[in-house]
Amino acid sequence: MRPSERAPDQLRAVTLETGVNRYAEGSCLIGFGHTKVLVTATVEENVPGWMRNKGAGWVTAEYGMLPRATHTRGRREAAAGKQTGRTQEIQRLIGRSLRAVVDLKALGERQITLDCDVVQADGGTRTAAITGAWVALRLATKYLLDEGVLKTDPILGQVAAVSCGVFNGVPVLDLDYEEDSNAEADSNFVLTGVGDIVEIQATGEKRGFTRAEFESLYGLAEKGINELFALQRAAIGG
């Protein structure tokens, strides 16, 4: 039995609220149960120096946790003067995941930055950030298309992510913090709308896990991500 009493293949309650920031070209507040992540998309009419004069744009991401996103207050990384390795790893993952479904040439020489701020953390913040960031990015590119800034849609498809793990010997979908901190194995899957793999992170925490268990986790991830794709489409109006 899972602590939340969910079935092994059941996502937490997922919510996607759009238009939560009046200034950003795209914004989304995504919830996976008690995990809440605010994502804003900012369009800038320039690209990093190493991308100049290449006729293509760039999509990048930043990730951070608000001080009281967890049970105890965490110091702001800005106050500490540097980002942790975890933060850098996660924001690179978010950027890679989004670029997998973007035609950078169609974007033109402009950059879209997805700022992912964890308001409340209860496991799965990186996967929630990726799933919500796609919604904010899609809204930002739709804005650019509607305004006539872009002539060709740069979005090639959807991307979403979910965690899976082995908890009490059973493969389960979408781990919350209690499950994640006690899992025998955990993983994160990032898949596109056509089923391509962008990234898989899988780790044996308390023991190694078998190929059969991995395939079970993969199957759970596909099921959960397909449900997330439907929620993404509903959030952007189809």
Curated annotation (Swiss-Prot):
Example of a GO biological process term: rRNA processing
Catalytic activity, EC: 2.7.7.56
CDD domains, per the entry: RNase_PH_bact
Keywords: Nucleotidyltransferase, RNA-binding, rRNA processing, Transferase, tRNA processing, tRNA-binding
Subunit details: Homohexameric ring arranged as a trimer of dimers.
Protein purpose: Phosphorolytic 3'-5' exoribonuclease that plays an important role in tRNA 3'-end maturation. Removes nucleotide residues following the 3'-CCA terminus of tRNAs; can also add nucleotides to the ends of RNA molecules by using nucleoside diphosphates as substrates, but this may not be physiologically important. Probably plays a role in initiation of 16S rRNA degradation (leading to ribosome degradation) during starvation.
PANTHER family membership: EXOSOME COMPLEX COMPONENT, EXOSOME COMPLEX COMPONENT RRP41
Family stated for the protein in its record: Belongs to the RNase PH family.
UniProt name for this protein: Ribonuclease PH
Organism the protein comes from: Caulobacter vibrioides (strain NA1000 / CB15N)
Lineage: Bacteria, Pseudomonadati, Pseudomonadota, Alphaproteobacteria, Caulobacterales
Gene name linked to the record: rph
